[in-house]
From Swiss-Prot:
This is Small ribosomal subunit protein uS12. Residues 1-22, 100-123 are annotated as: Disordered. CDD domains: Ribosomal_S12 (cd03368). NCBIfam families: rpsL_bact. One of its GO terms (molecular function) is structural constituent of ribosome. It comes from Pseudomonas putida (strain ATCC 47054 / DSM 6125 / CFBP 8728 / NCIMB 11950 / KT2440).
Length: 123
């Protein structure tokens, strides 16, 4: 136990919390340009071809971002909005692209959970 004199001389250190999404710099979303759109395979025990894009953000960061939903229209030089949220079985992918904003289209034929995939309400 420290004495009061010791604490006056050198106060207790506050533990600093490290951000899970440093490239967003405390913003809810960030805009960026796709530099590469590709598929990659997940860690064991899962098996799939996950759609991922490499994005150069407006603040200079370059990050990998997951493209959720079935089918997408992204290619190189597409302007996308990314949000935080990692993909557990893809190492190094800590961001998601926001569907239905900027150059990213919503998911076609989606009826449930539409707001997460940028799909308009069916007539």
């Amino acid at each position: 136990m420290a004495t009061i004199n010791q604490l006056v001389r050198q106060p207790r250190k506050r533990s600093v919390e490290k951000s899970d999404v440093p490239a967003l710099q405390n913003c809810p979303q960030r805009r960026g340009v796709c530099t590469r759109v590709y598929t990659t395979t997940p860690k064991k025990p899962n098996s799939a071809l996950r759609k991922v894009c490499r994005v150069r953000l407006t603040n200079g960061f370059e990050v990998s971002s997951y493209i959720g939903g079935e089918g997408h229209n992204l290619q190189e030089h597409s302007v996308v909005l990314i949000r935080g949220g990692r993909v557990k079985d893809l190492p190094g992918v800590r961001y998601h692209t926001v569907r239905g904003s900027l150059d990213t289209s919503g998911v076609k034929g989606r009826n449930q959970g539409r707001s997460k995939y940028g799909t308009k309400r069916p007539k």
